[in-house]
């Protein structure tokens, strides 16, 4: 007789109703009773196994501390809070106790919290005895909790683990200080977009090490690479950056949900004023590249130089050219924007004459930001963050200012200590002193496309790159940044084309 499987205490009646007519009633009752006993034992075993598995998941979930690498800007903090709610909702639907979810920008007023290491002591003190993992992710990382638990279960939580999706340089690059020049592929570092995890034994070890070897005053340039400079990264294939709807995402515990944030209609061309820093010696080789590539995307653009040349045209700001730093020139641009440009222009972008940029994509991105807030946006670097330093936007990838940010900056009287001071770092110091946070966007790039891992760029729609050295800048622009690509290809096709380059 086929045996009916079911849950709860209601299985016996349907089973008995399905019994066929038997010639020996006593025997039939005996057989049915034996059948019932077997099924009860099986059901009890199944329920016990299910309950045990459920309790195990509950315990495992409580042992993970989720840390979202969030930012205080209103757009980014909202996205981080949305992710926090998603994590808690998944846990609630599983019927489990809610895990701890931390947002980095809420954890520490210290400007270096985003570099993670300054938080190791707090992680160790707060969670070193009652947790097994610290799981880090970005605001656009999407997590499937059950699959994440299944993935972490493969690793002995009593050992030191550094887990993530592995990236590597294909050739040595300036942004990583030409590290591992003989074979840069041997060094693996995590892609933050896929999420990454530290076991508590490793967190405790790092916290103890930082007690005896305090963080030095130094530059933070590429955090994910510098975080990989220590215990070896163990690649985890379930930590993914595939799109949520990709067929590849079936096996993934994490995915990445956004390539280029868009929050409505792109801002108008006339709402962005672009200032190009140049000098006479580059009028003939760099400015023509700008005119062949992105200049036509901008409605308002001016070239600022040490020499006025009407054919371009350039504007002499009366600040002598310097071989480095350019702080005097940058602050003169800020003054000019505030005092001479239309008061209705809400955004200023300052770029170098060898910056390649997509104004079309920038217009989309800026739809997510409120120009009435003091916004200072670009690729974030840091200096001396372990010892009370500051963050700054690196100038080569482009610096984006809201008018409100410039007004607050100039009203503060913070200024250059010399014309050749590093403008981006001085701006970082000034905004830090004002309590205005730097807003990081990884779509801005200080270096060339070839200086970044292919897998890292594959989940981006980049906004800028920098430097013409050893490349064909016009070709690179039309490969990576030209607006016609949005009309001609889907994001997936773009990525496939880039992989073939």
Regions picked out by a protein language model, each given a short descriptive name:
Residues 2-501:
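Secretory-pathway lumenal glyco-enzymes, predominantly type II signal-anchor Golgi glycosyltransferases
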């Amino acid at each position: 007789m086929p045996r009916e499987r079911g849950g709860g205490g209601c299985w016996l009646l349907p089973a008995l109703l399905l019994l066929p007519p038997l010639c020996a009633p006593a025997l039939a009752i005996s057989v049915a009773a034996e059948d019932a006993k077997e099924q009860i034992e099986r059901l009890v075993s199944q329920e016990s196994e299910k309950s045990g598995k459920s309790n195990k998941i509950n315990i495992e979930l409580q042992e993970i501390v989720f840390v979202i690498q969030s930012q205080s800007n209103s757009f980014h903090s909202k996205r981080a809070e949305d992710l926090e709610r998603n994590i808690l909702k998944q846990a609630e639907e599983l019927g489990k106790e809610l895990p701890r979810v931390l947002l980095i920008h809420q954890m520490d007023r210290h400007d270096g919290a985003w570099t993670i290491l300054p938080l190791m002591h707090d992680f160790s003190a707060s969670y070193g005895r009652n947790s097994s993992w610290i799981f880090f992710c970005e605001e656009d990382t999407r997590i499937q909790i059950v699959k994440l638990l299944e993935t972490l279960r493969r690793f002995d939580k009593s050992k030191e683990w550094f887990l993530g999706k592995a990236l590597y340089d294909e050739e040595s690059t300036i942004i990583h200080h030409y590290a591992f020049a003989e074979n840069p592929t041997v060094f693996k570092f995590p892609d933050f977009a896929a999420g990454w995890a530290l076991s508590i034994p490793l967190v405790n070890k790092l916290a103890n090490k930082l007690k005896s070897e305090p963080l030095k005053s130094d530059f933070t340039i590429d955090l994910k690479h510098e975080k990989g400079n220590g215990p070896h990264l163990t690649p985890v294939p379930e930590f993914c950056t595939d799109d949520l709807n990709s067929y590849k995402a079936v096996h993934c515990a994490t995915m990445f949900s956004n390539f280029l944030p868009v929050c409505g209609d792109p801002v108008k061309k006339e709402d962005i004023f672009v200032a190009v820093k140049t000098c006479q010696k580059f009028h003939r080789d760099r400015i023509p590249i700008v005119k062949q590539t992105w200049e036509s995307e901008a409605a308002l653009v001016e070239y600022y130089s040490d020499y006025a040349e009407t054919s371009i045209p350039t504007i002499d700001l009366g600040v002598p050219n310097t071989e480095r730093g350019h702080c005097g020139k940058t602050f003169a641009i800020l003054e000019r924007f505030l005092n001479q440009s239309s008061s209705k222009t809400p955004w200023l972008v300052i770029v170098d004459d060898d910056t390649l940029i997509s104004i079309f994509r920038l217009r989309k991105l800026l739809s997510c930001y409120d120009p009435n807030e003091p916004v200072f946006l670009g690729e974030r670097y840091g200096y001396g963050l372990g010892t009370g330093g500051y963050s700054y936007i690196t100038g080569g990838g482009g610096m984006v200012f809201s008018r409100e940010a410039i007004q607050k900056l100039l009203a503060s009287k913070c200024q250059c200590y010399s014309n050749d001071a590093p403008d981006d770092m001085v701006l970082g110091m000034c905004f830090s002193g004002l309590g205005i946070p730097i807003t990081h966007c990884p779509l801005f790039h200080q270096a060339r496309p070839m200086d970044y891992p292919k897998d890292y760029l594959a989940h981006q729609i980049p906004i800028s790159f920098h430097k013409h050295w050893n490349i064909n800048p016009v070709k690179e622009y039309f490969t990576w940044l030209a607006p016609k690509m949005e009309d001609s290809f889907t994001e997936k096709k773009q990525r496939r084309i880039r992989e073939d380059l």
